[in-house]
């Protein structure tokens, strides 16, 4: 790393004022601060000194996503070999999944970072780090058969209209990755739902077997269409079920959650409240809900199926788009969990529910914080008046 530091110091004058690459200073600054903590000194103002900056925080989130991503790659291969009947061992399945998922990661980063580079150059600012996380989240929350060109269009839409128009990193109202999924869901519904998108039917570089018209339903999709409550299986916990690339394994997601909670990056209040809200609403529907598979599904199945765990750990805890007051985090998380189950039960056309629940609560997060703050002010005023009397 010292050699790299010396090399960057050597070429840095070329990117400063008067240098021959001055036009690309924002690109150089973004790359430099990604690798090393900035050594710039503030001229005025009060600042908090810490050994970690936002890029380091984003890097920790990406590390927390790695277990779910790696398992997702394996599961993509496992589901393909299992559905097509092709012969293959662990490494064949993992390599197949790796080759299927890698292009989506590349497209996500190339399109998203490309737009951020252009915006940074236009605004003459340093490249912002927020897409470091969004770029890996996007391919993890889509089906494996999502076409690359559609993913590119959706990524561009979300970066421009859900992030840059609001001012960039830290200013967005909605979770960028979920806006990508929402755009895909409403603009290209056949590529995001049904039984033909969750398992790849193609052979990749000789691995696997090509099968036309391969259809495999997710447990939630089967419950919404078959009229039967899916029987609980440990595959629902380990993640060996059809679904979006990175959302199926509760164990892998839990490993990421432990890291986020241990480092203090994610709020346990928000995360815990999402599960409480989901379990409570599932229990309510079990008790008084309609006689449908979604309404009668046990609360623990609701929590481990679909994107519930992934959304609770990596989406609801987004510090930019979630509630920021301590009490507000409980309310915000609880309402997300409850709303996700309500959408699942009452809207057969959307058996997932988590995406819409989080985006809806992103809208209400500022209002929740406002009500909490005003409530605290009101209580303190009453205590002050009472003590003066």
Regions found by a protein language model. Give the residues of each.
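Membrane-interface helix-loop-helix junctions at boundaries between adjacent transmembrane segments
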Residues: 126-207
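Loop-to-transmembrane alpha-helix initiation sites
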Residues: 173-178, 300-306, 329, 348-361
């Amino acid at each position: 790393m010292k050699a790299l530091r010396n090399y960057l110091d050597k070429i840095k004058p070329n990117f400063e004022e008067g240098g021959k690459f001055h036009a690309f200073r924002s690109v150089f600054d973004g790359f430099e601060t990604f690798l090393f903590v900035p050594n710039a000194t503030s001229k005025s103002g009060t600042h908090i000194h810490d050994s970690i900056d936002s890029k380091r925080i984003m890097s920790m989130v990406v590390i927390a996503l790695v277990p779910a991503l790696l398992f997702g790659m394996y599961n993509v291969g496992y589901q393909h070999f299992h559905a097509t009947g092709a012969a293959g061992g662990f490494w064949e399945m993992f390599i197949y999944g790796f080759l299927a998922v890698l292009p989506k990661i590349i497209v996500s980063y190339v399109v998203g970072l490309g737009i951020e580079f252009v915006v940074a150059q236009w605004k003459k600012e340093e490249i912002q780090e927020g897409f470091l996380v969004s770029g890996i989240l996007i391919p993890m929350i889509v089906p494996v058969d999502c076409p690359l060109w559609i993913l590119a269009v959706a990524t561009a839409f979300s970066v421009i209209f859900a992030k840059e128009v609001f001012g960039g990193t830290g200013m967005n109202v909605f979770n960028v990755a979920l806006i990508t999924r929402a755009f895909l869901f409403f603009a290209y519904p056949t590529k995001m739902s049904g039984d033909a998108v969750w398992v790849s039917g193609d052979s990749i570089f000789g691995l696997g077997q090509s099968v036309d018209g391969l259809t495999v339903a997710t447990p939630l999709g089967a419950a919404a269409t078959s009229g039967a409550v899916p029987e609980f299986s440990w595959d629902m916990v380990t993640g060996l079920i059809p679904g979006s690339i990175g959302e199926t394994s509760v164990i892998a997601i839990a490993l990421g959650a432990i890291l986020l909670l241990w480092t203090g990056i994610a709020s346990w209040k928000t995360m815990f409240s999402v599960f409480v809200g989901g379990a409570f609403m599932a229990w309510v529907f079990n008790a008084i809900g309609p006689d449908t598979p979604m309404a009668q599904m046990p609360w623990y199945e609701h929590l481990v199926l679909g994107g519930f765990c992934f959304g609770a750990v990596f989406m609801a805890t987004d510090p930019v788009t979630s509630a920021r007051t301590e009490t507000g985090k409980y309310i915000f998380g609880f309402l997300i969990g409850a709303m996700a189950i309500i959408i699942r039960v009452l809207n057969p056309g959307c058996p997932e529910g988590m995406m819409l629940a989080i985006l809806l609560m992103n809208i209400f997060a500022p209002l929740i914080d406002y009500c909490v703050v005003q409530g605290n002010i009101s209580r303190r005023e009453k205590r002050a008046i009472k003590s003066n009397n």
